[in-house]
């Protein structure tokens, strides 16, 4: 058995080597992301492992089928950049890593919220320019807030577990309710109720056709003045121009974003001194009440180890058993 893994970073390599030593399976590590220029490297391999934000194009799976490869494993959760029709057409099974470290993402979302509540970006800016006064940048306390969690899967529940000890009131919305949270009476029946009651809204749902721009101008209009928005899920959940308008009006007091709807080509790139040709993104970056991280909420040592080794486990199982506990089946 031979596996080829694309987009392997230096920080992933030790965990890949550890897995190879333990499993006695050959794995070729390719540093470049998977695309049409390097798919031919997969010839003579039994499975492909990958992780990237840019789209996987249909021709890649045609090539895999041509090479006799029927096992494709992602080192991440999201499948929104994978063409399901191409997988079905080429009889390729796909797996993901549904939970590599929910706490990593939840912890950063809470960290960024605390920084916004206490005006940390504002103080950093002022002090860098010689202004050491605390006024007028008075902060807020999380124990006085109502946090609305949209999506109560692994990450959403981890976020709830962190918010509650701070003394925040937590309410939640999910189409699929968690029985334990329901017993606590945490759920509201509609998103509108959550928008109206919460002054912090945090997103922890996958990107689907039905939730594209779920936070749009109408949704922002239903929120309290001075609401804080956290998006550590998928960029397409937020209508960014509508968010900018809500920030301008004061409807939104601040936003912490680990994702952006047009992030491909912006995040995970060293731009140096070159300007980014995206006026909407540049507007976000110019605001001291907006904190942006480059889709890095997952990026902890435990998470990276899990992403690499669980993906390789999945790929091995797809090759050996034609199935994996983390196989994703499209309808």
Curated annotation (Swiss-Prot):
The keyword Oxidoreductase is annotated on this UniProt entry: yes
Keyword line: NAD, Oxidoreductase
Keyword DNA-binding: no
CDD domains noted in UniProt: LDH
Residues at the active site: 234, 263, 295 (proton donor)
Coiled-coil regions, chain positions: none
Binding partners and assembly: Homodimer.
Role: Has both D-lactate and D-glycerate dehydrogenase activities. Equally active on pyruvate and hydroxypyruvate.
The protein's name in its UniProt record: D-lactate/D-glycerate dehydrogenase
Organism of this sequence: Pediococcus acidilactici
Gene (UniProt): ldhD
């Amino acid at each position: 058995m031979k596996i080829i893994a694309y987009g392997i970073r230096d920080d992933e390599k030790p965990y890949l080597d550890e897995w190879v030593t333990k499993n006695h399976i050959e794995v070729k590590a390719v540093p470049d992301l998977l695309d049409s220029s390097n798919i031919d490297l997969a010839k003579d391999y039994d499975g492909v492992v990958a992780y990237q934000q840019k789209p996987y194009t249909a021709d890649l799976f045609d090539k895999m089928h041509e090479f006799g490869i029927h096992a494709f494993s992602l080192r991440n959760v999201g499948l929104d950049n994978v063409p399901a029709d191409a997988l079905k057409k080429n009889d390729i099974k796909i797996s993901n890593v549904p939970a590599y470290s929910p706490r990593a993402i939840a912890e950063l979302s809470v960290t960024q919220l605390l920084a916004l509540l206490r005006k940390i970006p504002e103080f950093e800016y002022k002090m860098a320019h010689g202004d050491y006064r605390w006024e007028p940048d008075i902060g807020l306390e999380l124990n006085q807030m109502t946090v609305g969690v949209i999506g109560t899967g692994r990450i959403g529940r981890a976020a709830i577990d962190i918010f509650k000890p701070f003394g925040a009131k937590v309410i939640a919305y999910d189409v699929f309710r968690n029985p334990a949270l329901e017993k606590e009476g945490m759920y509201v029946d509609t998103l509108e109720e959550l928008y109206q009651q919460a002054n912090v809204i945090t997103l922890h749902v996958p990107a689907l056709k039905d939730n594209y721009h779920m936070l749009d101008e109408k949704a922002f209009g239903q929120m309290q003045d001075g609401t804080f928005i956290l998006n550590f899920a998928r960029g397409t959940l937020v209508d960014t121009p509508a968010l900018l308008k809500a920030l301008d009006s004061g409807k939104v007091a601040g936003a912490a974003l680990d994702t952006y709807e047009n992030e491909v080509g912006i995040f995970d790139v060293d731009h140096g001194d070159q300007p980014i040709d995206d006026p909407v993104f540049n507007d976000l970056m110019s605001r001291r009440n907006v904190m942006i991280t480059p889709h890095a909420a997952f990026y902890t040592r435990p998470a990276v180890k899990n992403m690499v080794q669980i993906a390789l486990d999945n790929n091995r199982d797809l090759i050996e058993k034609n199935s994996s506990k983390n196989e994703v089946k499209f309808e």
